[in-house]
């Protein structure tokens, strides 16, 4: 395992990349409504990223089990947990949820963030899943401080979600991030306090709870990218990129624009 500690200047570059990702999610948020296809959202995201001088990291991302990822964002609707491929057949409907995972490479460093959106009016049960998953993200971030361990992050996420009856995905994790989209260490959403890699100043990690309404079992689709819940129940996914900076967690990505639009 090789963990790359970032300098103050490198963290600033990562902040810029992650702010662009946050702005891209904000741009996508303007178009989340019934009747829109996931391919339309992908085109909006790719244009915005490229117009701002960056490269969509996910596009052509390699897959050891199949074809490279063909799009600029992952669009995971309802029971799709992660890696949904945008297409012109998936049309958003009132009551859907859609997780949009976005990555961008700007000036040599990566940004990565995900937000689960409501399409129109969703049920109170689904809203609670989203709220709990977002809360778990921030509880995990609170534990991303120098001197704690990776297990402290996962334990905080797991305890919050499982105490409310939700499934915590094991097979998919957060990760280190920097010049590469996926670096060491892995950041699971479960664990034991005080276990795992020691957190140090300069580490940059993506924390991303992936939480299911029902059983946590996952099923891989034939495209070798799309991963769904096996029981067909919905899943939520929220992600921030965080720097352990001056001893504490600093969130480099942003939901500010998305949440502003949600309030209006």
Positions of predicted regions on the chain:
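Active-site neighborhoods and metal-handling regions in enzymes and metal-associated proteins
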Residues: 1-264
């Amino acid at each position: 395992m090789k963990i790359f500690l970032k300098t103050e200047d490198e963290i600033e570059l990562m902040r810029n990349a992650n702010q662009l990702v946050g702005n891209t999610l904000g741009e996508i948020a303007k178009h989340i409504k019934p009747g829109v296809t996931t391919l339309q959202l992908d085109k909006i995201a790719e244009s915005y990223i490229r117009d701002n001088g960056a490269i969509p990291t996910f596009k052509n991302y390699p897959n050891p089990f199949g074809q490279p990822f063909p799009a600029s964002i992952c669009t995971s609707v309802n029971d799709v947990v992660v890696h949904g491929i945008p297409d012109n057949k998936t049309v958003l409907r009132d009551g859907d949820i859609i997780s949009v995972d976005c990555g961008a490479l700007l000036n040599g460093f990566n940004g990565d963030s995900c937000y689960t959106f409501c399409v129109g009016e969703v049920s109170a049960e689904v809203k609670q899943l989203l709220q709990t998953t977002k809360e778990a993200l921030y509880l995990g971030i609170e534990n991303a401080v120098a001197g704690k361990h990776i297990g402290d992050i996962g334990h905080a996420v797991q305890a919050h979600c499982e105490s409310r009856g939700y499934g915590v995905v094991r097979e998919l994790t957060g990760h280190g991030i920097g010049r590469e989209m996926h670096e060491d260490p892995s950041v699971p959403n479960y664990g034991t306090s005080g276990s795992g890699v020691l957190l140090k100043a300069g580490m940059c990690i993506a924390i991303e709870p992936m939480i299911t309404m029902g059983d946590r079992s996952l099923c891989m689709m034939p495209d070798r990218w799309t991963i769904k819940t096996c029981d067909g129940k919905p899943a939520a996914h929220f992600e921030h990129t965080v720097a352990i900076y001056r001893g504490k967690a600093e969130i480099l990505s942003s939901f500010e624009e998305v949440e502003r639009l949600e309030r209006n």
